[in-house]
């Protein structure tokens, strides 16, 4: 089953567009786990177990593991997710961006070492930096396009030439992903929830690609506006929330609290989709 197929199956089975981001910070761990980097796996596995039936995907951020020399715990977590939630695709948030043999090694890391179903990439170095990942049949790759951070304006919102009618850089990336770069049919785009107008523009340029949309929750993105801007029938969106869910409680009930917040967010997204369908139906 390809990554795109897995997304569709998880969306139907779990009635969800919600992705839970796994960004473990031991200093923020609740209760008995507080401050203990050796418990990264335990913390993340508890979140996974509590939310696996509510999500379209999980998204572990590799830096949060590597910073604590916890890559072995990430490997265990990937195996755990495959075991307890085989229907839910896992997006490795790595934002790699290199060329040639180095990119090939990063692709091996993502898809062979960790067994991810998809990976996030920076396309700044051009197609050479993306091509090694496309050799993996059925594996997904999300290109950074219009990210949720304020500094994204420095590059992504600039025109390719100082002439009216020329596309902005993020629009050009979307066109490449929708067209000539999508050799394995599994490309997607990262577009921040903090910019709903840009989400709508990306969706117009790339009408069929899956959109990974971070920024809902702690970053302040509006869930309903995100769905209205990006969701279309047959064009999936994966709306990520990390800190608002995984740190919903500072006590030992953190997994139960994460489930409650994930359920609330999922239902907000589903209600917004239902509203969009009603508006679109004559």
Curated annotation (Swiss-Prot):
What EC number(s) is this enzyme filed under? 4.1.1.23
Biological processes annotated in GO: 'de novo' pyrimidine nucleobase biosynthetic process; 'de novo' UMP biosynthetic process
Q: Where is the active site?
A: 95
What Pfam families is this protein classified in? Answer: OMPdecase (PF00215)
What reaction does this enzyme carry out catalytically?
orotidine 5'-phosphate + H(+) = UMP + CO2
User: Superkingdom of the source?
Assistant: Bacteria
List the pathway annotation.
Answer: Pyrimidine metabolism; UMP biosynthesis via de novo pathway; UMP from orotate: step 2/2
InterPro entries from the UniProt entry: Aldolase_TIM (IPR013785), OMPdecase_AS (IPR018089), OMPdecase_type-2 (IPR011995), OMPdeCOase_dom (IPR001754), RibuloseP-bd_barrel (IPR011060)
What EC class does the entry list?
A: lyase
GO MF term (any one)? orotidine-5'-phosphate decarboxylase activity
The answer to whether the entry has keyword Cell wall biogenesis/degradation is: no
For this UniProt record, the keywords arranged alphabetically read as follows: Decarboxylase, Lyase, Pyrimidine biosynthesis
Keyword presence, Zinc: no
Q: Which family does it belong to?
A: Belongs to the OMP decarboxylase family. Type 2 subfamily.
Q: Entry's NCBIfam families?
A: pyrF_sub2
Its recorded name reads: Orotidine 5'-phosphate decarboxylase
Upper taxonomic classification of the species? Bacteria, Pseudomonadati, Pseudomonadota, Betaproteobacteria, Burkholderiales
